[in-house]
């Protein structure tokens, strides 16, 4: 889907056209008797439309993705996790919506870019579909409005697709700016699309789960090894995009997010936390504490427990962890020097 990261890129980069000015944004009515708890759970993003002319430049690259909504860290927030294919790599982006005094209306504000998004749930039956409208206000770019269609399943009946089209048209979105997403299937963060072999250049391959280890296999280089960039500070670059990427923070020994402008920058720039960790993490990560993090994605991963001297499974919340986080037991053992599976049997008293 267009999750927070991609939606932010779309809206922040969208200028108001002088030749065809965007009209004042309409008042939006939310779903009557909106029930917040019923909107939680997993959704598939099936369609998008926008008054932003920039959409036409990327619509052929967009594909169906997923969004998971959960209770936030506080009662005033909703936690969002979107998973999508981007440039041949599956990436996961977490974010937070702020609740307002209007049920069904949420805010996302980025002070650095002086941009506020207002999202409204305008139509939903909770068990089948939901239509969101999002307003963007910027003193630099003017107002835009974006419509998104979600389904509990990857397919919806035709009448709901038509309802979405009518909603989008009713708020001024042009017919040629309504896009129904290609279904490329769900993805696991860090995985590569089969056809994206060109992405293997100048980066360490993210190995399949069954063969996953420390990533110490051959690295294809193209002027500069990715590892050589791990100690650099992140660089947003001079362009004005809002692409959420990961960089390795040597001080915290963790991969953290930053917004990449879309051009130049440096090699400490990764599409996923998994790719970042497998390229930059060192054995020093094995001495770090096991950190679940404040988010609530609850992904089952592996970490090295120094007190027990072995790799253990734990539930990772999805954000603000550290480098002591591995995507398979084998990878953990290879990094942290744990003996093979037969070791305990041989040494047991």
Curated annotation (Swiss-Prot):
The precursor is proteolytically processed into separately functioning proteins. Residues 230-280, 286-336 form the BPTI/Kunitz inhibitor domain. 3-hydroxy-L-kynurenine binds at residues 52, 110, 136, 148. SUPFAM superfamilies: BPTI-like (SSF57362), Lipocalins (SSF50814). GO terms for cellular component: cytosol; endoplasmic reticulum; extracellular region; mitochondrial inner membrane; nuclear membrane; plasma membrane. The keyword Endoplasmic reticulum applies. Its EC number is 1.6.2.-. Disulfide bonds join 90-187, 230-280, 239-263, 255-276, 286-336, 295-319, 311-332. GO terms for molecular function: heme binding; IgA binding; oxidoreductase activity; protein homodimerization activity; serine-type endopeptidase inhibitor activity. SMART domains: KU (SM00131). PROSITE patterns: BPTI_KUNITZ_1, BPTI_KUNITZ_2, LIPOCALIN. Residues 1-19 form the signal peptide. CDD domains: Kunitz_bikunin_1-like, Kunitz_bikunin_2-like, lipocalin_A1M-like. Pfam families: Kunitz_BPTI (PF00014), Lipocalin (PF00061). Glycans are attached at residues 35, 114, 214. It is an enzyme of class 1 (oxidoreductase). Expressed by the liver and secreted in plasma. The record marks 240-241 as: Inhibitory (P1) (chymotrypsin, elastase). The record marks 296-297 as: Inhibitory (P1) (trypsin). In the N-terminal section; belongs to the calycin superfamily. Lipocalin family. PANTHER family: PROTEIN AMBP. This is Protein AMBP. The lineage of its organism: Eukaryota, Metazoa, Chordata, Craniata, Vertebrata. The gene is AMBP.
